[in-house]
Swiss-Prot record:
A GO molecular function held by the record: DNA binding
Pfam families: SfsA (PF03749), SfsA_N (PF17746)
Domain of life from the UniProt record: Bacteria
Source species of the chain: Clostridium beijerinckii (strain ATCC 51743 / NCIMB 8052)
InterPro entries linked to this entry: SfsA (IPR005224), SfsA_C (IPR040452), SfsA_N (IPR041465)
Gene3D superfamilies: 2.40.50.580, 3.40.1350.60
HAMAP family: SfsA (MF_00095)
UniProt family annotation: Belongs to the SfsA family.
Name by which UniProt lists this protein: Sugar fermentation stimulation protein homolog
Length: 226
């Protein structure tokens, strides 16, 4: 996945979930933050950030914050990009073989999953979660309580009971981490439900990514510790 019109900046302040003030070429600019998570460990004053410039006159802001440098790590913060990189990854023959159909935003009962996939022998629902929280190489999800995430896991279990295969894919938006684990300190119910989902047949997958200031692509599988 490739971005265009990327600029380098310096983070100043995030007054709410949706915008941040960033210094770009000596000027203070308002940027849309493409991640509504807390990201407090990433967006600290003077952090180096990467911004995508958008020339669409209908947008309220012409800049979007997509990446940040934490120590020696480049971390992609774009929560909208994870589905795109998973789609590309599956199309290249990863995760599943003999894929005959990939349908994004697939409806299941009264909800939607990120993907519905068919192979020659299986019908599969997939939910994707982006991961940006890292400490000493250990990455965790979520960075804030997520009732929606718990709901998705329970619905994936329902899919299994109805004869589908089911996956939750944690896309770690950085490279070379130690392992992934649920953030039970922040949301114990999510961690418990994730473990229960695995026990009931849901496939739990974590992958890291090669991240540059203007690109992100899935690199390899990462160990999952529940």
């Amino acid at each position: 996945m490739k971005y265009n019109n990327i600029l380098k900046g310096k983070f100043i302040l995030r007054p709410n979930r949706f915008i941040a003030y960033v210094e770009i070429d000596g000027n203070e600019e308002v940027c849309h933050v493409k991640n509504t998570g807390r990201c407090k460990e990433l967006l600290i004053p003077n952090a180096t950030v990467f911004i995508q410039k958008n020339d669409n006159p209908k947008r309220k802001t012409k800049f979007s914050l997509i990446g940040v440098v934490k120590g020696d790590r480049m971390i992609n913060m774009d929560s909208q990009v994870t589905n795109k990189v998973v789609h590309e990854w599956i199309l290249k023959g990863n995760l599943l073989k003999d894929v005959t159909l990939i349908k994004p935003e697939a409806k299941y009962k009264n909800s939607r999953f990120d993907f519905y996939v068919e192979t020659k022998h299986k019908k599969i629902f997939i939910e994707v979660k982006g991961v940006t929280l890292e400490n000493n190489g250990i990455v965790k999800f979520p960075d804030a309580p997520t009732e929606r995430g718990v709901k998705h896991l329970r619905e994936l279990i329902d899919c299994i009971k109805e004869g589908y295969d089911a996956y939750v894919i944690f896309v770690i938006q950085m490279k070379e981490v130690v392992h992934f684990e649920p953030n039970v300190e922040t949301h114990k119910e999510f961690g418990d439900t994730l473990k229960y989902a695995k026990e009931n047949g849901v496939n739990i997958v974590a992958v890291d990514c090669l991240v540059d200031e203007d690109s992100i692509n899935i690199r390899d599988y990462v160990d999952v510790i529940l």
